[in-house]
A protein has these predicted regions:
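C-terminal ends of transmembrane helices
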Residues: 26-39, 85-97, 187, 272-287, ...
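Intrinsically disordered, low-complexity non-transmembrane regions of multi-pass membrane transporters
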Residues: 1-18, 189-237, 278-283
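Entry/N-cap segments of selected transmembrane alpha helices
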Residues: 77, 92-121, 237-240, 292, ...
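Juxtamembrane and boundary regions of transmembrane helices in multi-pass small-molecule transporters
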Residues: 122-129, 173-217, 338-347, 392-410
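Hydrophobic transmembrane alpha-helices of secondary-active transporters
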Residues: 24, 51-59, 72-99, 268-277, ...
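Structural signature of hydrophobic alpha-helical transmembrane segments
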Residues: 9-23, 69-83, 132-139, 257-269, ...
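Alpha-helical membrane segments and immediately flanking helix-loop junctions
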Residues: 123-168, 175, 187, 205-207, ...
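Flexible hinge motifs at transmembrane-helix junctions and intramembrane kinks/re-entrant loops
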Residues: 31-47, 64, 68, 194, ...
Length: 410
């Protein structure tokens, strides 16, 4: 803790940042229960708690009273762990079940990716800006999120001489992340009510449950009534750690040829590990332990990311950038509404819209958080969950990186 120009500067360690995120999440969950309107519109708990924390901290920093610096090393670790579990869910056997819907959704999202870039580039040039700023405020930040923004920002600065490219991309990604979290679940809720979509709980009224396969063994401690999942957690944690370690090596190698988010290497290794297990039958990588790691890392990663948002930086955006971001928001809402009709006005379509808004203006974690908020109220959609995970966290990142690299060279 020190001071600079009269402003108190507090450095929060990595473990303290995790602790704050956990408390923030439960505060958001408590607030959601206490305010019926928040429950009605399925606003995610990490958003409620995290946005309040971010707002307070941003005000303190804006008025030069206090600046909080979070150590994000464990946030990065949690992000890698979460996306590694996504890779471990990428079973080719399951993907084939996604079939035409998976391919169709990927095609539609690729179109959105192109539209985001054309909109950003067009508006930037109309206002006399270098079109690269439009790309940075297009699919780099919108579809790519903070990770892709942090990767391509310096790349654009060094390759095309775009001054402040990293700041523009990260600020746009921050804006997109906030908007995606605020409108994703409420938009899905509106679709369900407006078009009277039949939900899983209306069909078979299942008990609330986590996204956990039921055909798994659990270890029971002798003398205890409740099962413990220590062996499964240990096995899952070991597999995730190995995939992350090997993935870091792969990411470093791939980084010599193409700019990709840090988690891509871990996801590729995880997908290989999963499918080797599926086809060889030698081991199984799914289970309650893997599900627990995925959910815990998702909640903490998203909450930590929101806690660290510099909301006051949005006030410093130039008018042209604000216009581009407003245009991207309108495009996303209209496109999501069109997607709902394209995919048949079903509950799966609703969930694809909620998840699509999340990762098309922020990150896959945001999309899954939006979907989880809806699933808690109306029931899960396993197929939509899988498709959003595969397309948002893996397939579209590869396509987006290639697309941005190509369009940036125009």
């Amino acid at each position: 803790m020190n001071s600079s120009d009269g402003m108190l500067i507090v450095n929060v360690s990595a473990i303290q940042a995790v602790a704050i995120a956990a408390v923030t999440y439960y505060f958001g969950a408590w607030l959601r229960k206490k305010v019926p309107l928040l429950e009605k519109y399925s606003v995610p708990s990490p958003v409620l708690g995290g946005m309040l924390v971010a707002l307070v901290l941003s005000c303190l920093e804006y008025f030069r009273l206090m600046q909080i610096n979070f150590d994000t090393s464990l946030q990065t670790l949690l992000m890698l762990a979460f996306f590694t579990t996504i890779g471990l869910s990428a079973s080719l056997k399951i993907v084939t079940e996604g079939g035409k819907l998976l391919v169709s959704f990927l095609f539609v999202i690729t179109i959105l990716c192109v539209l985001q870039n054309f909109l950003g580039m067009g508006l930037a040039e109309m206002m006399g800006l270098d079109f690269h700023y439009g790309l940075l405020a297009g699919s780099v930040s919108m579809m790519g999120g903070l990770g892709t923004s942090a990767a391509f920002g310096p790349y654009f600065e060094q390759t095309y001489g775009v001054q402040g490219g990293t700041a523009v991309a990260i600020t746009a990604a921050t804006f997109g992340m906030v908007v995606a979290l605020l409108i994703g679940a409420p938009f899905a809720e509106w679709l369900i009510r407006k078009y009277k979509v039949l939900t899983p709980k209306e069909v078979d009224n299942p008990e609330p449950e986590l996204h956990i396969p039921e055909d798994l063994e659990t270890a029971v401690v002798e003398g205890e009534k409740e099962p413990t999942y220590t062996p499964q957690l240990l096995k899952a944690g070991t597999i995730v750690a190995i995939c992350m370690g090997l993935g870091a090596v792969l990411s470093q190698y791939m980084g010599q040829y193409i700019t990709l988010p840090a988690y891509i290497g871990s996801m590729i290794v995880a997908a290989i590990v999963r499918n080797v297990g599926d086809f060889s039958g030698k081991y199984m990588v799914e289970g309650k332990g893997m599900n627990a790691i995925a959910e815990i890392s998702l909640v903490l990663f998203v909450t930590m990311a929101i806690n660290g948002l510099k909301l006051h930086e949005l006030l410093n955006l130039a008018l042209p950038l604000m216009i581009i971001l407003a245009g991207q928001t309108i495009l996303m809402v209209v496109f999501a509404w069109v997607m709902f009709f394209i995919f048949g006005k079903t509950y799966d379509a609703v969930m694809l819209c909620a998840g699509g808004i999340g990762f098309s203006m922020g990150s896959t974690a945001n999309g899954l958080a939006n979907m989880q908020a809806i699933a808690e109220k109306y029931g899960s959609s396993p197929r939509a969950w899988l498709i959003i995970s595969l397309v948002g966290a893996f397939l579209i990142d590869l396509i987006n990186a290639l697309l941005v690299t190509w369009m940036g060279a125009w």
